[in-house]
Amino acid sequence: MTVPSDVLSGIRSLRGSGVLPLGATEMTPEGLRVCVDRCATFRGVLCGITPYLRPAAQRQGCVLINCPALHTKQTVPSPDTLALGQLRTVLIADHLGAQLRRQGYTVSFCPALPQDSDIVNFLKTLGIDWPTVPVSWTNEDREEKMKKALENSTYRDREIERGKRRSGGEEIEGERRGIKEDVRINLKQVVQDENLQGYDPSLGTCTVQREALCHLAQLDSATTDFPISTTTALHVTSCQDEFRQQQTAMLWRATGATAVQRLVICGPVKTPGIQMNAAQYLQLRKAQMKDASEMKYGDQVEGQTWDDIIKVMTSATMRFELLSTVHTSPVTLDVQRDSGVSTKGPRGGVFVMYNCARLHTLFSSYEKGVEQGLYPEIPGGTELDFSALKEEGEWLLLFNYLIPFSELLDQSGQILEHEGSTARVNLRTEQVCRFLVSLSKDFSSYYNRVHVLGEPLPHLFNQMFCRLLLLRALRELYHSALDSLNLPPIPQL
């Protein structure tokens, strides 16, 4: 088989972002064999790491992330009333917000929650900074605005209202719900007129309830400063509440809202044989993390520093358990009290944080060696010979993780911009957690096999410095990825 000379010349002259430096090219019976110049690739990536640690593209636009699980029903939600499936939607919403902001989007969250409420403090424990309003705040003006918009909507179904006019006593009950008379909206007509795809065909005529008005008022408030032409609303909800959220989305459309609306549907969270709410789940994982730490470190586990470490590790455990599965699929949790958590088993958040902490320890040891005069400072990358990185594990860490990371960070924005216009959207919220677990397995295997800080002998320094540059880039990658999960790195575990 022969390759035309112009094609061969074109391949050899390729340059640009994402194109690795080429070494030898040769013709074989199977075709053209192209070899990457590994030494030049290590130098190019490790001496210019910044672009690899941020999204491949910066975007513009506004995204409203709406979490129906946090909307007030009869009362403000609390950790004791928040189901695990609902907690999963909140964590996914938080992760999406962090990712989209880094890609350049302006992000707003909905609903705003009462300051210092139990649910706000619970979310803070998990590292979630949700928007709040004063306890005395009301949204009655916007509720009235939404009610009038629906009363005057072209989609109001007056024929059905006339056919089902209620008795006087029932009208009084309607007034208590905030609506003097039933307002019914033909949602099916909204879907048809707007030519919307992927909505439930059984969406019909919906009677507007006070709860829906509160929800619509929150949506309206959260998008006040957003230009409608560039706004996308992501409703992150459980599969059990999908139909209700489709109704709410179409009611909002019926008020005249024109923002693009997409649904991020999350599968259920199962705890076989046990009923458990979000507060109980947090308490269990925190107790298990404390037990594991005391087993390893004994009496050292006390004071504010350890409280902070256990808090972060608990959040990491919960986030990885609930985010590592494709968001449309169910999650099954092991919530037996005696099952415990391990710092070394490759099972998720604890394993990832443990390996990130190992890098912190490595560089602390190196810096102490520099202070003691054992090692010189790492020289500039142009002074190093990267051919010293001969381990296949070193190439694997560069090629499988450092090089593609920026594309991973860019994924959710790409999908929002280019993936159709149906009701549902799959934003692959599991990718960062899975990436970190896979990275931690490969890094752990490499780190257990290779002695990075060798004897302080000049002829060994070049290889040591090359490895330190590689691992410093990995440490920055860990920090960048964990930041999208609102998890700060910890110094020890």
Each language-model region and where it sits:
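Non-catalytic interaction-recognition regions
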Residues: 1-493
